[in-house]
Amino acid sequence: MKKKINRLSLFILDVLIVLLIGVVIFILLTGGKVFYIGTTLVRLQGVENPLTFLFILGIIRYLLSQKAPFLGLATIDKNTIAERCSTLCNRLFLGIANLETYKIYRIVLLIIGISLIIKIFNAYCFYGFFSGDDVEIHEMTFSYLFDWGTKAWNIRSPFYPMVFIFPVQAILFSLGINEPFYLIFSGRMVVVLFSALNLYLVFIIAARLFKSMPVGLFSMFFLALSKLHTTMGSSELPRTIASTCILVAFWLMLQEKNQRILVPVAGMVLAIGASIRFSEAIFLVPAFFYLFLHKRLRQAFSLVALFVVAFAFINYLSDKLYWGQPFFSLKNLVDFTILKKQSTRGFQPLLYYILSIGLWTNYFSFGLMLCSLRQNLKKIWIWVAAPILLLSLFPHKEPRYLLPVIPFYCIMVGLSVWGLLGRIYHNDFKIRIQKRISTPILVLMIPLIGIVIQAQKEPRFGYLVFLFSGLIIAVYFLQDKIKRNNGVPYQREKVNASNIAVMLVLALLGVIIFEVNGFFFRRSESGVEMARFLRMQKDNRGVAIEEIWRAGGRLYLWQKPLLLNIERSLIKERKHFVSSIKGNSIGWVGIRDNSLSRYGYASLLYDFGFKEVKFSEKIRLETYRLFKKENNDSNQEMDCSD
């Protein structure tokens, strides 16, 4: 009877493990779903929680029985797993090493093609907005297309939107296509194409730098796999194109012929990237020191000189033509962010980018990148370390700011993986490790894995990752020292290539899971659906919307006589909300569902004569609710006290 209960328990555990694996695969393929079970909203998004439960169940299953067959079908043997991982790595190494050049280029085109399809899907299906920045880019181009007479925020340089986004929109507009949806999509397609160029540039740069096409292939693969590259490459935000300029500049610096001409040209290309996004000027630092460390000092100074001249010329001319004053946006940016310190974006700690590794990449590829430090990196590390250090000094930090760093980061990861595959194939590992993992280290490692999984979505877990990692290292050396002092050193053995193969396969699996998990670029689709609905209404009364940028600002609603933004920071104040919706000029109010329920504004809107209008049947994570004022004569004096 006891054996039957144990078998049943193991079978139930196995079934739960299979179900969780199915959930993870479902989320990776669909991006997850939001749905109702009765009246309860269920959010099945992100693989972190299912993977954490899967890891816990796996540990329990292992502790209960190592010999019982999984689902009663087959026993999972550690030696068999190691052997199969080793075989897989060896086949991968030989397969790529023996590829003919034309086949490698076919794979390159295949990867670029798949990446393009994913980005086009993102750009078309997720038609919302990521931040106010993307809205402002289109507002600058739309103001010319539709002759608004007003322009966007005056701290944004017109160089990027007017040179890269405006031309394709102007062509469509001249053909009679004036629907904002298609104009916005066309702007995003420009960035999608540049992201494809970035993939090819990484391939040729890595292949040339390390004289290895497999390294170039792996580097490009990891860039295509990058969630940051994929999501930002399917938006209208400028860093993807700025990244193209940085990669082109680096490629020019690698050329062995005509260096006196090409290096100054590289400086001008860097200036274009910095003019697209001012913060990219920091890449002048790694460019200078890269040349300096290669003893090309004269070329380094010529690069800086041409950068300064080109940057000044571009910003003088673009601001003069758009704003009517040279350096207008640059001066306003310095005044707003540095002198007056009026930026409301928030401030992050100095170590934010290290603690938020899971947001801009993943801990598995980060570990692989660290492995590359033992190889000859050709000084490429400076293109990763210097920008991260400099960006860490800025008060406001976001994962997307590291987008131009990602290509160089992926080159380091690609070099590391190809090197490890070669060493596994040749069994070329000279390091020695202790035969058995001690209990204290094992006790620390188990929660560390769970913490790493959760740290992929929550930077606060980053502190625990480094805390537990430090404790493991400290315990390892402390135990070693105690044993040596007692005259009983640890028994050590040469590391087995098959064990490294297992770790590499698991690391690559982790990279794929956590990067693909971030592929689907959901934005403010509900807000845009609401704006498109309002655009079709003949009611010309004003519109008040919470965080109006989520609805596209003026992009869809510029014909409305009044657009009022209800600031998120003030919506909790009842008096502010009432002042926003009060009066006959406002006929429509759009408010996020969580704000409506949190502050109880539904009854208040009904009291002012508003009734809810359905504009979409889709269930989304971030949902807007739309209210229309039916009674224009409603001027009741309401109790506005908090």
Model regions: which residues?
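Perimembrane helix-loop-helix junctions
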Residues: 84, 88-91, 250-270, 282-313, ...
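Short hydrophobic/aromatic helix or loop-helix immediately within or flanking a transmembrane segment
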Residues: 137-140, 144, 152-180, 193, ...
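Catalytic lumenal/periplasmic loop and adjoining terminal transmembrane helix
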Residues: 120-128, 320, 445-472, 476-480, ...
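Transmembrane signal-anchor helices characteristic of membrane glycosylation enzymes that use polyprenol
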Residues: 19-28, 103-131, 225, 272-276, ...
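Transmembrane-helix motifs of polytopic, lipid-linked glycan transferases
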Residues: 185-210, 248
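Hydrophobic, aromatic-rich transmembrane alpha-helices
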Residues: 356-381, 386-388, 426, 439-448, ...
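Membrane-lumen/periplasm interface segments of specific transmembrane helices
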Residues: 283-346, 350-367, 381, 391-394, ...
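Short acidic/glycine- and proline-prone juxtamembrane loop motifs at membrane-interface regions
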Residues: 130-132, 156-157, 228-241, 398-399
